[in-house]
Amino acid sequence: MDENGASFQVLCLATIGFHHLRGPEIEHLFPESMDFPKEWSILPFLSLPDGAHSSEKDFVYFTLPFPNDEGTVFGLSCTRQLNASSLKNIPSDVTRSSVQKAVVVITTSPPFGHIKDNLDIVTNAYFSQGDFSNLDVLRDFFHVLTRKEQDVHIALNINLKSFLCEWRQNALVLLKVLLLGKRILVYDKSAERLGNFQYSLLSLIPCMMSHLQDVSSPSAHSLEKSLHKPASLQTSDKRSLLAYTGFPLIIFGEGSMFSPYTPLQLVHVLEAKSSTSWLAGTTNTLIMLNQNKMAEVIVRSDTHQIEFVDPTIKNLTSLTYTDKSWMEDIISRVESSLEMELPGFEGSDDWIRNQFELYIFGMLATVKYYNFLKKQDDSILSQYHYLPSTSCISDYGETFLLEWMKTNTFRIWNNIADDDLFDVILPKHPCKEEHKVPISARIATLFSAVKITPKSRDGEDEGSKEPAV
């Protein structure tokens, strides 16, 4: 599975309508012979979000448990409303001036790119008919999505440049909060903006977007059970290096969940004692009024504000001087390249991901190095001909690193990542990189020219102790 995209399967297509007495309900389902899973009974409430009547069009991202399995499916709903007078045949149960419906796609991976674009087009065509009983356009769309010969890959298609320019240095604060496994509630009147914000944040973490199979339920932890410490490292293989470094990081393991849109009907899951960590989004003001009882951090993606319900988290995730300098440099480079759309170009979305990849790689190497130093006596350390600088610890923030080492994410990662990781990847904040070296050269060094060298002590092999990165 590729980091810039994930192969996927379309499981079903549905239409959701809003009945003035019964509320949101499923009207049509493709394939029509599908045995609808009981685990998806919440689908109508996910597809037509709270406040949907206040906008003509919106997109909703949501997650559901995979039927009879430890896994997750991903939903994308395109909501529209139409003036009832525009209908050719007004159904007897339509008693309001407007009709509100959604067309929904359920897939095995987050649906972005052309799936979203095509869903928008098809939904518009379905509404433009003025006859909701004519399902031909939906039936044809489903057949196109499920053609066996179609090899579908979904590009992330997330605008990280906008995300970074809007959130600026707080983008790194939010990443630190996420890494610490806190309970994060995101609010926005726009469900589309709500989902885009959360997926943008997740996409900053290497391998995250292709390893979201456990996010729909706090009880799911199949990914953790499948991980193991690699027996070897192939320096020319990026996947091998990622595995050696301990990826994927289990941000949403047992006790955690990711719910990009959360209706009132799911609030009890967030409030449960078993839900110790989550990232959840809402458009409902009632949930916001009650947020202090369950969330530790409140994010307003519409106004770009962060509220720390627990003030200690603000201190733990505050940026170091080195963090701030690094973010200033990245933002400057992004803003100077806003008109450039070439993939991989300095300031592009791929380039931004590479920067945060280097940041997290350096952080993980720093944690291993920190623990190595703590285990050794000064008399032993003095025998080494070379050891990396310890400035990396303060550059990332010692209190932040210590707090991260209390998380479930750290526990799982520490068991599978090699203890000598800092021999391969230099424990160094990316702000300390030599800016004269092009990013392409640094990435090439990281993934193509890694060489493992033993720590050299007196009387032992004195191979170069300088890590490759």
UniProtKB/Swiss-Prot annotation:
Main location (coarse class): cytoplasm
Keywords: Cytoplasm
Compartmental location: Cytoplasm
Pfam families: Avl9
Domain cDENN: 163-332
Assigned GO CC terms: cytoplasm; endosome
PROSITE patterns on file: DENN
Keyword Cytoplasm: yes
Limits of the uDENN domain: 11-150
BP-aspect Gene Ontology terms: post-Golgi vesicle-mediated transport
Protein function: Functions in the late secretory pathway. Required for the generation of secretory vesicles as well as for actin polarization and polarized growth.
Xref: PANTHER family: LATE SECRETORY PATHWAY PROTEIN AVL9 HOMOLOG (PTHR31017:SF1), LATE SECRETORY PATHWAY PROTEIN AVL9-RELATED (PTHR31017)
Protein name (record): Late secretory pathway protein avl9
Species in which this protein is naturally found: Schizosaccharomyces pombe (strain 972 / ATCC 24843)
Gene that specifies this protein: avl9
